[in-house]
């Protein structure tokens, strides 16, 4: 493809609450075996983009570990490959990234040393599958300076959490509102852009000169009436992880057959780092219905409408309903869990009762484990 990729994965949000204490949002576990960033990385390699930069910052340890080998996404190359950028103190700079535009500016050499004419920019917290070649073809056909991907928002109340755009008949962006109370349209910006590399360098350098740091506010919105910015609609599944409720809802969507088939049965595939773990084990007395169960898990109880990630142990006479159990969780006997998200590495003592009443309840239990 005639483009390089740039994934912005350094953000933090208070709406993730306790779930963001261990990891960046881009490293949040999804659908049993995956991380959020896997979807953007897979889209890049499936679109034949062979050179990708990932910008990280907040709580990036888990994300860096996940990206430690680029072979899983076919980026183990002599030319191109996967490049991970973190804030670093230099003679010219002693600050962390102050925004998305600033994070690109502090790694501008990645763009200047590349030769591809276009750049595809994507967020690391979007759950979707698309061919960026279609976006690039649309961008060229429209003669646009910048093209962004948009999707229809099913619930109008969600507009307060996203950037909402309005298009004219020529698919040009005529209005962009950042997190409005009442949106003028139902089109949400997905945080995916294509732009000519030289133009991006020019705009980013101008932002730096004027001490402007945000890509959306200081480039997309500011230049909306100066540059030709077009919107490319996608009609397939798209979700963004920006809150505990988003995270819960997105994972639960994977219990729907059409969503699972779209991501995991239809070409192309979604790739992730593979752990060598044994298959899940269902002991006598277990009963599992409409759930996703990852490798290394042992189940002795009842699991219904839930997602269990890797290395989860469910004790005898346990009931787990409509819940998400993250990696390496031990659940003691006679435990009831419903409408909850159990943080990784947790130990739920026997005879416990947890139920989320108003939305999903986040459980962080750090009791001692005894292995005999």
Predicted segments with their positions:
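Unchanged
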Residues: 1-254, 364-365
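Left-handed beta-helix
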Residues: 1-4, 198, 206-372
């Amino acid at each position: 493809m005639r483009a390089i990729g740039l994934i912005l994965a350094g953000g933090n949000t208070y709406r993730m609450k306790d779930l963001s204490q261990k990891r960046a949002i881009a490293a949040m576990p999804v659908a049993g075996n995956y991380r959020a960033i896997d979807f953007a990385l897979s889209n890049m390699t499936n679109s034949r983009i062979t050179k990708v930069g990932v910008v990280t910052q907040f709580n990036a340890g888990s994300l860096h570990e996940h990206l430690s080998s680029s072979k899983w996404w076919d980026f183990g190359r002599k030319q191109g490959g996967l490049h991970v950028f973190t804030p670093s103190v230099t003679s010219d700079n002693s600050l962390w990234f102050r925004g998305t535009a600033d994070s690109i500016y502090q790694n501008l050499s990645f763009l200047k040393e590349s030769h591809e004419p276009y750049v595809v920019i994507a967020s690391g917290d979007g759950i979707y599958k698309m061919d960026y070649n279609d976006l690039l073809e649309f961008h060229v056909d429209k003669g646009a300076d910048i093209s962004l991907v948009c999707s229809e928002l099913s619930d109008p109340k969600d507009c307060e959490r996203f950037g909402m755009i309005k298009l004219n008949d020529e698919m040009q962006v005529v209005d962009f509102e950042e997190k409005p109370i009442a949106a003028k349209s139902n089109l949400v910006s997905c945080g995916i852009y294509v732009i000519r590399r030289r133009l991006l360098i020019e705009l980013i350098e101008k932002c730096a000169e004027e001490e402007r740091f945000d890509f959306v506010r200081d480039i997309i919105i500011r230049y909306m009436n100066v540059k030709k910015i077009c919107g490319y609609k996608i009609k397939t599944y798209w979700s963004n992880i920006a809150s505990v409720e988003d995270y819960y809802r997105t994972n639960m969507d994977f219990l729907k057959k059409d969503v699972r088939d779209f991501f995991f049965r239809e070409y192309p595939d979604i790739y992730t780092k593979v752990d060598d773990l044994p298959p899940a084990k269902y002991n006598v007395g277990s009963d599992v219905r409409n759930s996703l169960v990852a490798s290394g898990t042992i189940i002795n109880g009842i699991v219904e409408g839930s997602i269990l990630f890797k290395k989860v142990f469910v004790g005898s006479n346990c009931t787990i309903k409509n819940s998400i159990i993250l990696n390496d969780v031990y659940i003691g006997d006679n435990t009831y869990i419903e409408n909850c998200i159990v943080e990784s590495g947790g130990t739920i003592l026997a005879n416990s009762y947890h139920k989320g009443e108003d939305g999903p309840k986040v459980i962080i239990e750090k009791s001692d484990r005894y292995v005999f």
